[in-house]
């Protein structure tokens, strides 16, 4: 089963949509992240693995492939931890797949707690432009977004 979770990335100061596709398949157990990830994105495998266990779920003993699309754009930072976790849990049937109108950003600690990420304001503005109806971010980032002007206010 392939589960797609919406997220966002930054290219310079402009936000763009990233589709986080999570697939479980047979074969030797592995956890691969593809789609031009940087070192921090590749390290998300260990944070996600620990968070799955911390939330009381079993980590799948199968081949896990996470594709970050569009593959031609470099993905940087820890912003994809949360969408990878949600995609993995949905792919193995532990949670329902997220609604298509929702997007997710957030770094995971080894306990599964969310940590703030950088660049949420331009990503939130891109989310509004892309028609995202619900944007889920760590609490520390939500405070910043709540006190910032609406993307509609900045377009005038």
Residue locations for each model-derived region?
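Peripheral, non-AAA+ core regions of ATP-driven protein-machinery
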Residues: 1-148, 152
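N-terminal low-complexity segments that are often proline-rich with Ser/Thr-Pro
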Residues: 154-156
């Amino acid at each position: 089963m392939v589960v797609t979770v919406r997220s966002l990335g930054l290219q310079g100061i402009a936000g763009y949509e990233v589709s986080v596709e999570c697939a479980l398949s047979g074969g030797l157990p592995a956890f691969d992240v593809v789609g031009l990830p940087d070192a921090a994105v590749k390290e998300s495998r260990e944070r996600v693995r620990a968070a799955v266990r911390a939330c009381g779920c079993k980590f799948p003993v199968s081949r896990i492939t996470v594709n970050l699309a569009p593959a031609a754009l470099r993905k940087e930072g820890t912003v994809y931890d949360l969408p990878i976790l949600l995609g993995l849990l949905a792919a193995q049937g532990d949670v329902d797949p997220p609604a298509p109108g929702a997007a997710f950003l957030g770094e995971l600690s080894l306990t599964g707690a969310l940590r703030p990420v950088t660049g949420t304001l331009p990503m939130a503005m891109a989310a509004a432009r892309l028609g995202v109806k619900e944007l889920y971010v760590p609490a520390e980032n939500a405070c910043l977004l709540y006190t910032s002007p609406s993307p509609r206010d900045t377009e005038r």
